[in-house]
């Protein structure tokens, strides 16, 4: 499996992978602890480069154990050189990710794609999404 467990960012308490996002001990946020040995054995630049032109090109690095089924065609948006802004900020090589090319014109499409598929893995039948309105 790609994911070992969930771990609290505050107290380091570990949990089995489940639909939890807050530590029961200290209410700190939980994050994914990856199984890097498994990932190293199952990923290659060649495999990534042959993948679909979407977020799913990086499926081996995402916290999903099953193949994706809910696909919004998000991700794989271009990097755009911001020469003038870079000069203004004193940066020689500034690039900006243009996520306005995602289905709802937002970076949030990536998160929703992964979360929707993870909810399906957990056999959830209802999914709600809080947003500021651009999702």
What are these regions (language model features)?
Residues 1-135:
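PLP-dependent amino-acid enzyme catalytic core
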């Amino acid at each position: 499996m790609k994911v070992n467990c969930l771990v609290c960012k505050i107290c380091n308490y570990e949990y089995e992978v489940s639909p939890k996002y807050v530590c029961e001990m200290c209410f700190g946020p939980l994050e994914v602890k990856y199984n890097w040995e498994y990932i190293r054995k199952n990923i290659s630049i060649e495999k990534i480069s042959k993948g679909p032109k979407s977020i799913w090109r990086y499926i081996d690095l995402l916290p999903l154990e099953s193949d994706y089924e809910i696909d919004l065609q998000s991700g794989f948006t271009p990097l755009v050189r911001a020469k003038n802004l870079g000069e203004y900020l004193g940066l020689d090589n500034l690039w900006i990710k243009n996520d306005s090319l995602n289905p709802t014109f937002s970076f949030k499409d990536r998160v929703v794609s992964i979360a929707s598929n993870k909810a399906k893995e957990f056999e959830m039948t209802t999914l709600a999404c809080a947003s500021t309105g651009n999702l």
